[in-house]
Amino acid sequence: MKFSAYRLVLLLAALLCVAGCRPSTHYVTVEGSVLGTTFRIKARTTLPADEIYTEVMALDEEMKHSMSIFDETSLLSRINRGESDSLDSHLIYNILAADSVSRLSDGMYDITVKPLVEAWGFAGKEGQKTPNIDSILPLVGYRKIRIEGNRLVKDDPRIQLDFNSIGKGYMVDLIARMLERNGSENYLVTIAGSGRCRGVNGQGGKWRIGIETPYDNNFSDRDLQRIAEVTDISYTTSGNYRR
């Protein structure tokens, strides 16, 4: 049976239609500000850049209302002032994650350090020249808080939490999950020095991450100690020389 020219044209038209109906994937770059610092996304995705940006801004607002110590109306600020003990999903997740790291580090990591952070002049508040640490230490200790249901129980109502050390990495994970839900398998998400990457970059190679040389005035110089080529990891590159 001969394959007519008419049928051939119909077949080619159908193939072109199928190809044209498939969403095109390409690398997009999205940049902006979240959590009081900068973010950058490079991803191979069908999502347009403006849609990704809108999603990120929505997450930023959600995080500020939940975990910000700078927004006096946030849920965390109200908990720290003793006005609420209710926890949302973001706070529960991060309290449990922080507790795990605290136990693994034998208390070297601790989210109850907010009174100490303020005493030494971080968190935007003027600190004391010689803080009275002995009076503050009774309010610090990850074993002095626990979750019961959806509520936070403190051994002392004056205990306060600070998620600045974990919040950026958590938001990186939220953005990465959003990209993956929309089919992206190749991306790099960074917020300040925290990041997560998967797959390959636009050239088909591993993602290249710059690690700054750790000295005091390198905030402006941005000298690099080395460039690491990585994939399928989460990481942080900023150290205590930033503070």
What does each model-identified segment do?
Residues K2-L8, L15, A19-R243:
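Mature catalytic core of soluble alpha/beta enzymes
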